[in-house]
Structure formats: structure tokens, C-alpha cells
Amino acid sequence: MTITISRIHALEILDSRGNPTLQVGVTLSDGSFAQAGVPSGASTGSREALELRDGDAQRYLGKGVQKALANVKNHFAPALIGKPIYDLAALDRIMLAQDGTDFKTHLGANAILGVSLALARAKGASLKKPLYAVLCPQEEYTLPVPMMNIINGGEHADNSVDIQEFMIVPAGFDRFSEALRAGSEIFHTLKKVLKEQGLNTAVGDEGGFAPDLPSNEAAFAVIMQAIERAGYRAGEQIFLAMDAAASEFYREGRYHLASEQKAYTSAEFVDYLADLCRRYPIVSIEDGLHESDWDGWQLLTQSLGERVQLVGDDLFVTNSAILQEGIDKGVANAILIKPNQIGSLSETLQTIALADAAHYAAIISHRSGETEDTTIADIAVATTATQIKTGSLCRSDRVAKYNRLLTIEDELGTRARYAAKAAFLGKIKA
């Protein structure tokens, strides 16, 4: 019996920042039902697919998503109801054709993605299989290394720190559950260290602490203290990573670090980052330069690419065409994967496959405005992405993804392995 789509319903819900977003539910002809929530970013790349907002200042301060909801109801539901559920990519193509634009500016990436993810989940419900097994049926699966954002700055926090994310990377363990435990213990130890220094322990959008610090380097220093006090070995069990989000402090050809009252040329900022990497066990730098500073990116890649993971987020925006441009120019060596940057599940998977073919690491990522949806955890397990960014060890919208990965590891048993240091393609010595 062919299982078909019988109902698609969209609802305006709130994300973790209290802003509206879409939740889409799909019902199939066999009675199976699933739903998905759509995340939203704060620090966004200029070439991301369009997140359609209403712009009505009298409602949710202009951030409502009734237009996107209407597009689900009036465009996608009529086009998809009655179609077989089996070929998810074909269903995505129907929606993409209806939109007809490169950046989903007609019907909205949030509308398309909500339906795309809900369709995939509904297929899993019908087959009585977890989403990761629907996306990639195989005998063994790899659990990703988490990149845990424990100090927030930049656009993710109201503090004096320029760099947006300071992360711990527990790559020196045998199981995901062990890595998660280490991250949790370091997070709570960091809170104690900050309190002892009279610093703020309020958290930012992604659950990390947001203290006022005298410099960006001071964030690494206090994290190193927390790692040691928690009983772990930095550079062996726990590594560091950062998301500079450099596009946010790039003006008139210079990188302006307000907390340090300094401005750098591209070459000088590459030297600044290289110096940090010499003094701290930093294994990954995301968006180290402005998204349009391709010459600077080439310099950064030449300087650090052999020993540090250089991740393009705003640079590549999960877009396979832009990633291919970067591959051709020898820029970066990894890509951040955010499904809502491109706007459909099938295009997300296509970009991950391209990265893998080019030997670029792929890191699945949340957004700063999240929901309880855990789809990205399943995508990380199903694909060749060996790392995941889903925030700190705080806030249920972040922890939900970690708990989903714990559940997957438990149900797979001996069929699961942890990516560990191998996730970084030789950047960490085993």
C-alpha cells in the first residue's frame, strides 16, 4: 500500500528568544504524524536563504510569521497532499519549484524547511524508524563530537566580549556520553570560577555564560582554569574552539575589537588568531574573517589550515554552490551546516555530501533562536558530519539535542562509535 501525505498544518509558535517561528505538522494516510520546528539566527550571513517575516510592527514587533504560515497552507499543502511520502528529495523539489528563487525570497526558507523536516519525520513515523535510520540506513553510526559554547559574546550576549562563542571540545573520550559528562562538569566548574572572580554568571542566547571580561583572550584563560579544576587535561581530553563571527566587527577594511580598543588589517588579524592558537589548545576557528574577505581567508588557510580546523559559516551559508567556490579557491577546510541557511533538508544533505567529497569537515549546527526540535542530532548521526554545535550545557532548547544524542547512543549500543579526535581530520594527534 502506498503511503501518501494527507494533511499539512502550520502553527506559529515561539522560539527560545520569545520570537515567533513555524511549527509544521504532517499527517500521512496510514495515520502517522510528526512535526518539526524551525530555528532562527541572530548573526546571519548576507547570502542566507530568506527567513520570511511579516513586517507588521503592530504584531510581535514585526517578527510574526503569518505570511510563511499562509504559504504552507496555500502553496505547499495543496501541492503535496496526495503525494507518496517515500522520495523526500522529490517532495522538496516541488516546493523549491513553487518558490522559484535562489534564496527562497518568494515563499520563505522557514516555510519550506518546516515542511521539509516534518515530511522526513513523518516518513520515519510511518516506517517506525528513527530519523537517522531513515536518512541513512546502515549497520554502524558515528556520534558527533560536541562543540560546547560555554562563554557567549558578540551578537549572542550583552557584554564586552567581541568574539561570539568560546567553546570546549571534548574529543579525547571513547563515548559521546563520557564527552557530555565532561562538558557538563566543566560548565558547572566554570560557573564557580566566574563567581569567585566576581563575574556575572547570567547566560546568553545559547546557554553559555556572558561575563564582562577585559579581553577576548581572558575568556580562554578562565575556561582553561575551569578545565583544570574539573579534573580534565586540556590539549589531551578537552580542546578549545571559537566562533569569531568576524563579519560582525568588520568595518571599513578593519577588524575592530572594541574590548581591546584595537583595529586589525586582515593580515594582522590572521596573526592575532595564530598567536592565540600557539598559546591555547585551539582546534577550530569559525568565521575567523569577514564573509567577503576571500583574500584574507586564503591567507588564514595558508597560515593555519594544516593544524587548525577553519570553519566557514557566514562564508558558505550551507550553500553548495558557494562551498564549491571556496573549495576551488582553497579557502577554509570545514563548513558549518545550518539547515535554515539553505532552507530544505535535501539541499542540506547535498552540501554535506559535497564537503565530504572535498575532504572538508562538516559541523551540524543549531541557531541562537531554537525550539525543542532535535532534528539536527539525527542529521549529525546519519551523515558524514562528525561534529555538532548545539550550545551550552544549559537551557532545555540546547540540552534537548544532547539528550537526543544520548538516546541514540543508548539504542544503538555496540553499533555506535564516537568520532573523537578523528573528527578533526588529522588536526588533533591521536
From Swiss-Prot:
One of its GO terms (cellular component) is cell surface. Mg(2+) binds at residues 243, 286, 313. GO terms for molecular function: magnesium ion binding; phosphopyruvate hydratase activity. One of its GO terms (biological process) is glycolytic process. This is Enolase. Catalyzes the reversible conversion of 2-phosphoglycerate (2-PG) into phosphoenolpyruvate (PEP). It is essential for the degradation of carbohydrates via glycolysis. Pathway: Carbohydrate degradation; glycolysis; pyruvate from D-glyceraldehyde 3-phosphate: step 4/5. It comes from Dichelobacter nodosus (strain VCS1703A). PANTHER family: ENOLASE (PTHR11902:SF1).
